[in-house]
Amino acid sequence: MSQTKTKSKPADPAKRARTVIWILLGAIVAAGAIWYAVFTLNKPEPVAVQPVADAQLVREDSHRVTTPAVEKGQLVEFLDFECEACKAAEPVVAELKAEFGDRITFINRYFPLPSHRNSAQAALAVEAAAQQGKYEQMYAKMFETQSQWGEKQDSQAPLFRTFAQELGLDLAAYDAAVASEATKDRIRKDIADGKALGVTGTPTFFLNGEKLTLNSMEEFRQKLADAAQ
């Protein structure tokens, strides 16, 4: 006697995609707990994590990407160039920057996560470009090309060097900056501040010193609008 097989109902693709996204974001945040040890693994004398009292949300050399004539507030973002969530947030941040950049100072700080093999190297490349006045150009290049180099397990430093060449940088100066302990310490300082301030994943935003927990772009925009008054 034959038996009739009951066909299972196909999974909802949208629901499955949402589940994958939340799992991915959860993994990104969880990975932040071990960032410091991995990033300083190859440094003979690791930089000690600063106590909270010494942490600074904004330093003199922090990258200010807007410079309002009259500042109403500061939005600080700790980011990782290999982080998919950071890339997804970038168009939102760009839109808010265009809307509020004349009143809010937008500030970027490095926070490469250890789960991303090339995020620290990407930060070095961006900082090296910044030393030649091309911070924003290299910043944009990293996110534009993330799908090309993100999640690779081999070093992408040669690719990043081609980006420097495309941007017209002095390659000798770029190479020296990437290899410089001063450049590496510049990034480690951002990481140490972030950890001391409670950053465990990316992107993490602080508005006027307050760490934000955001549920929607509308909420994000409203917080900036309130600060910009």
Predicted feature residues:
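Extracytoplasmic thiol/disulfide redox context detector
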Residues: 2-114, 188-191, 226-229
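Cysteine-centric redox/oxidoreductase cores and disulfide-bonded domains
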Residues: 113-202, 206-229
